UniProtKB/Swiss-Prot annotation:
One of its GO terms (biological process) is tRNA pseudouridine synthesis. Substrate binds at residue 110. The keyword Transferase does not apply. It comes from Exiguobacterium sibiricum (strain DSM 17290 / CCUG 55495 / CIP 109462 / JCM 13490 / 255-15). This is tRNA pseudouridine synthase A. Belongs to the tRNA pseudouridine synthase TruA family. It comes from the Bacteria. The active site is at 52 (nucleophile). GO terms for molecular function: RNA binding; tRNA pseudouridine(38-40) synthase activity. Homodimer. It catalyses: uridine(38/39/40) in tRNA = pseudouridine(38/39/40) in tRNA. Coiled coil: none annotated.
């Protein structure tokens, strides 16, 4: 038995998230059904983490076991032939049998896209902001999020873990034409953390909060003091990081 690690991208518009669930089509379900067709038996797919309904991925990582005598490059071609067009396999590598797509993760990068003008072709991939934003103020607020903090104010109350301390290594706002891209790289993120941080930073940009309010929100450890949760369709799981020893055979 061999273990394959695949990097996949998907448009989450028509899916109820990544993880298999009773109601609604999911990315994991489609992947497992496709691999099942290839193998003629059920194949379990493990992902680096969940993404919610309508959230996209540029670099989700999965692993699965196979007894097929097939090269990784051929696996990419076979899967992309069978998968729907909104799910693509970007890369596939054979890895050691102890590689875990979920538990070996050492960091992740997320990006959130907003646009300042109407664009029919980007309506499901970025969020329209119909009001003016002060980009300089947003960047000042963004700087307060870098570092190790308790992010209780920036996650939903039902977050499963009691430990809400996370480290953000890098955070920046990129201007790209009519779009603004929030980029966050960190050790890991809490449920809805990116969307709440972005929603709050957009409120900074429109003057509802001052940049220094971000620091006070972190200290408060209270979800009620932060801003709204930004919509899901602007969010992308961009890249997942692993130790060098887990990169592949």
């Amino acid at each position: 038995m061999r273990r394959f690690k695949c990097t996949i991208q998907y448009d989450g518009t028509d899916y109820s998230g990544y993880q298999v669930q009773p109601n609604g089509l999911t990315i994991q379900e489609v992947l497992e059904k496709t691999l099942g067709r290839m193998h003629k038996h059920p194949v379990k797919v493990i992902g680096s983490g969940r993404t919610d309904a309508r959230v996209h991925a540029q670099g989700q990582v999965i692993h699965f076991d196979t007894e097929l005598s097939i090269a990784p490059a051929s696996m990419v071609k076979a899967l992309n032939t069978l998968l729907p067009d909104d799910i693509r396999v970007r890369d596939c590598k054979e890895v050691a049998s102890d590689f875990e797509a979920r538990y070996d993760v050492v960091g992740k990068e997320y990006r959130y896209f907003v646009r300042r003008t109407e664009n029919a072709f980007r309506r499901h991939q970025s969020v329209l902001i119909p009001y003016s934003l002060d980009v300089a103020q947003i960047r000042l607020g963004l700087a307060h999020l870098v570092g190790t903090h308790d992010f209780s104010s920036f996650c939903v109350a039902k977050t499963e873990t009691d430990n809400r301390v996370r480290t953000i290594y890098e955070a920046e706002l990129i201007e790209q034409g009519e779009e603004l891209i929030f980029r966050f790289q960190g050790s890991g993120f809490l449920y809805n953390q990116i969307r709440i941080m972005v929603g709050t930073l957009l409120d900074v940009g429109r003057g509802r909060f001052a940049p220094d309010d971000i620091k006070r929100m972190l200290e408060a450890k209270d979800r009620n003091v932060a801003g709204v949760t930004a919509p899901p369709h602007g969010l992308y799981l961009w890249e997942v990081f692993y130790p060098e020893s887990k990169k592949g055979i």
